[in-house]
A protein has these predicted regions:
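N-terminal secretory signal sequences
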Residues: 27-31, 54-57, 69-71, 156-174
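Bacterial Sec-dependent N-terminal signal peptides
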Residues: 16-56
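Sec-dependent bacterial lipoprotein signal peptides
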Residues: 1-19
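N-terminal glycine/threonine-rich, aromatic-flanked beta-hairpin/loop signature
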Residues: 64-157
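Edge beta-strand at a domain terminus
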Residues: 157-202
Length: 202
């Protein structure tokens, strides 16, 4: 009887420990389901979003950052286009993101991180605001340029759902003085035009 009790107690302890260990994890099937939903939406909206919703910012750009009234950097490449598989994509540096939603009239897009994203961003969503492209005050002799701002939450990560990213308040964001402030307390990023179509993909 004592042996049976000990075995039962041991099994309960292991079960409790296993459940505690799993309590902070995401169900793999649910994560995959969310990703599939996002990718299907991205694929469905690929042509429409890229060719219409992103009409004024499509192309390849040099990526810089503004602070204290000056924009510098412009060493990494930003591509906003449609990749060979038909998805709308936003790529910059080593980052590669699927564009899920965009609006050329409201000047925003939402992209989804890949499942391999780090810093707690796997499968999450981020909203990007941009300004109307201009043909003056563009660094490095570029023919046109625009400012953009990444809208993050208080943890500086993406949003868990598409609705969260879509409905996040942007009333505190302003492009009135993008070289100095207006993007979460910082200056905006700036993109200077290189070409209409990307020549290679990550």
């Amino acid at each position: 009887m004592k042996t049976t009790f000990k075995i039962t107690l041991t099994m309960l302890v292991f079960a409790f420990a296993f459940n505690c260990n799993q309590s902070g994890t995401v169900d793999k099937s649910k994560a995959n389901e969310n990703l599939v939903i996002g990718l299907v939406a991205g694929n469905t909206n690929g042509s429409t979003s890229v060719l219409t919703g992103l009409a004024e910012v499509r192309g390849v750009w040099k990526d810089g950052f503004c602070s204290g009234g000056t924009c510098t950097g412009f060493s990494s490449t930003l591509s906003i286009a449609q990749d060979p598989t038909g998805f709308g994509v936003w790529t910059t540096g080593s980052g590669y993101y699927r564009i899920i939603e965009s609006s050329n009239t409201e000047r925003y897009l939402i992209y989804q991180y890949l499942p391999t994203a780090t810093f707690g961003n796997a499968n999450k969503y981020t909203k990007i605001l941009w300004t109307q492209p201009q043909t003056t005050d563009c660094e490095n002799g570029a023919s046109k340029c625009f400012y953009y701002c990444t809208v993050l939450n208080s943890s500086f990560t993406g949003y868990s759902t598409l609705d969260e990213a879509r409905n996040v308040s942007t009333t505190s964001y302003s492009s009135t003085n993008p070289k100095t402030t207006g993007c979460g307390g910082f200056g905006w990023s700036k993109a200077t035009f290189l070409s209409s179509n990307p020549t290679s993909w990550p």
